[in-house]
Structure formats: structure tokens, C-alpha cells
A protein has these predicted regions:
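Basic amphipathic alpha-helical segments that dock to polyanions
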Residues: 71, 75-78
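Basic, amphipathic "hinge/linker" alpha-helix immediately C-terminal to the N-terminal HTH DNA-binding motif
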Residues: 90-114
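N-terminal helix-turn-helix DNA-binding core of bacterial DNA-binding proteins
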Residues: 21-70, 94-97, 128
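Amphipathic alpha-helical dimerization/coiled-coil segments
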Residues: 2-17, 105-129
Length: 129
């Protein structure tokens, strides 16, 4: 089934572009996966969580250049999409941890393959630029 991901985009729900994206996501696994993964910083966050449970502060320090607002938004997006789990310990000071969900764990080996592919193809494509 199609998730709300594309409907949250800037496209009007009755626009041709929206309907095309929705149809593609409903019928193509790659397109569906990419709607979940597309967005600046999402892959970086998932990669950190692939390594293990992380807290907001450590992710903020480790992901160079990400703003607090963007990290907060992307964590919410990934949680809403079911790729990560947020655990709030309800303590003072606040303690919140993030980890991959079952769906996120299934993505973990694919992230490794994407990383390997990127490392392999980058020098080839960079020569062509």
C-alpha cells in the first residue's frame, strides 16, 4: 500500500506529477524504497543507526553540517516511515535513543552495498566529469 510520504510533498494531491509519483510508488519497489530514503541526511542518519543505538547529541556531532532543525525533522520523518524507533526514557535530564526498526534492519545490508558501489563507481564517474 502507498504511504503518506509522497502526499507530504509540495505537490497538490490532484496534480499529474503527484498521481504519477503515487502510481510509480505503488507499482515499483525501487520507487517506493526511494520515496522513503530520499531526503538530505536520511542515509547518513540510517548509516549511524546501522552501527548501533544512538542519541540525538552524538548524531549531531558525528554528522558534519547537519542543523538541529534538520536532524530533528529527519528523525521524525524516519520514525513516521517506520525505519527507526525512538525510545524516550522520560528522565530528567531527557534521555532519548534511536535505533533501526525491523524494516530499518532489513535495509542495513543494502546500505553497505550502496556504500561499496559508491566507492567503486566514484573514481570512474569523476574521471568523466
Amino acid at each position: 500500500m502507498f504511504t503518506k510520504k509522497i502526499s507530504c510533498s509540495m505537490l497538490k494531491s490532484n496534480s499529474t506529477n503527484f498521481l504519477n509519483e503515487k502510481a510509480l510508488a505503488e507499482h515499483c519497489g525501487v520507487t517506493y524504497a526511494m520515496t522513503l530514503l530520499t531526503g538530505r541526511w536520511k542515509i547518513n542518519i540510517l548509516w549511524m543507526l546501522k552501527i548501533g543505538v544512538n542519541r540525538y547529541g552524538s548524531m549531531k556531532r558525528e554528522i558534519a553540517g547537519i542543523s538541529e532543525k534538520m536532524l530533528t525533522q529527519r528523525l521524525k520523518d524516519l520514525e513516521e516511515d517506520g525505519l527507526i524507533i525512538r525510545k524516550d526514557y522520560k528522565t530528567i535530564p531527557p534521555r532519548v535513543e534511536y535505533r533501526l526498526s525491523e524494516a530499518g534492519e532489513k535495509l542495513s545490508p543494502i546500505l553497505g552495498l550502496l556504500s561499496d558501489w559508491g566507492d567503486t563507481i566514484r573514481p570512474i564517474l569523476d574521471k568523466n566529469v
